[in-house]
Amino acid sequence: ILSKLYFRSKIRTIMTSATLTSATDGSVNDQYAYFLHNTGFPIERNGVLSEPKPSPYPYDEHAMIYFCDDLPHPTKEHAAFIEKGVDRLIQVLNISHGKALVLFTAKTDMEEVYAALQGRDLPFNILIQQDGASQERVLQKFREDTNSVLLGTGAYWEGISIEGKSLSNLVIFRLPFPVPDPIIEYKASIAKDPLMDVRVPEMIIKLKQGIGRLIRNYTDTGIVSIIDSRLRDDHPERYHDVTWNSLPIHRRTTDIREAERFYHEVCG
């Protein structure tokens, strides 16, 4: 459909996004491979790809990634993952005294974590994305209460911008692999390697979108906290290298004390 609408007429089409690429290694075509496959972009006829542009923001000076390396598997040991993940989340939230946006792929995970946090005596308000409610109202509460924590999913990964001191800790609660749907399942069914050709590129694009919520201007600072152990170097999955190489933040640690020191150095 995209090919018929945009690439087979005399009208010139420009496609632009901060997350068109799902890799940083290889040729320009390699970096756009998933986009090319999904859209039928006419690279062999008259299509032109531009070199991916680096972010203008000083990510490596202003941000660090903390990621867990000791949590249960999110799907194979789901109940244990939620329990241990909540404990680690609270540790992370205490570093920044709130000021955190926590992103979820699954609404059920978000609701479970919210219920668990409500049972703890935490020194900051926990806000949650509400069905049918005005999201702008929730976001305004988050902006005004600078020590609050906001749990969200869906459009919160890419559709919001919160600058300044209200957000200095962006938490990814579980890597955002795509939820199975007919489109994803069809792509996987025709792929040579469904994991590396479909699910990992989808996850990387979503992860980049989520991480992009943290640094919204030249003065924003903070940490990204990934509550998931599947990106550790010795994990049996094959995607940790391609994932790390695709992210704009290169400073990372599994030591929560190092993340805390960095946070207090750059955020005060």
Positions of predicted regions on the chain:
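ASCE RecA-like P-loop NTPase motor cores
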Residues: 1-268
